[in-house]
Amino acid sequence: TLASGNSGALFASLEAGSTPESAAGTLYGSVDPNPGAAQMFGDASGSIEQLIIRASQETHHMYGVRAAGLSPKQWRCLLQALIWQESRFTIGARSPVGAFGLTQIMPGTAQDLGIYPAYYENPYIQVTGGARYLAQMLAMFDGNVIHGLAAYNAGPGNVQRYGGVPPFAETQHYVQVIPERYNLYLA
């Protein structure tokens, strides 16, 4: 499985899957359930599915994605699983610690990515920002998807400090749930 770290063979075998459940449109609604989303973003935001597909296509070339050996479909499914875990596909999601949007980017990270403050107003920037940041974490950890996810959640310094997934309950859960969701989407 993805969680085992031996992702090459798994990705090759799962990519052939074409069950109806793997279609992005069946996995989440195309309209944000947040009643304020329409006022905040209008119809320019497009569906969440379209945002994820477009962002994954535009970031698939990044070194971290290539280092992880992810095909375009695998990258989309990983990004989709991350967004499910981070926000349950809610555009205006805000965490108690200040992370915002579909990909729950902290303001400081958004600043580093050059998307602050625009990501507060544009869901596409939320998704591409999260995709770029995840690709950076994958690059930092030589394509190791589990370490990249742990770094996305707990920060790269913690992954380096512990030599892998930190012993934080939230991060331990995070690196289990996203691969499970990824495998569901890819199947």
Report the location of each language-model feature.
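Proline-rich, low-complexity linker regions of envelope-associated factors in Gram-negative bacteria
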Residues: 1-42, 50
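Export/targeting segments at the very N-terminus of extracytoplasmic proteins
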Residues: 30-89
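Second-shell loop/turn segments in exported
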Residues: 34-43, 66-69, 91-96, 113-123, ...
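Solvent-exposed, polar/charged alpha-helical surfaces in well-ordered, non-transmembrane soluble domains
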Residues: 50-57, 77-80, 128-135, 146, ...
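A short secondary-structure junction motif
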Residues: 55-59, 109-113, 159, 185
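Substrate-binding/active-site groove segments that recognize
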Residues: 96-116, 129-135, 150, 154-157, ...
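Catalytic and substrate-binding regions of cell-wall glycan-acting enzymes that process beta-1,4-linked
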Residues: 143, 148-187
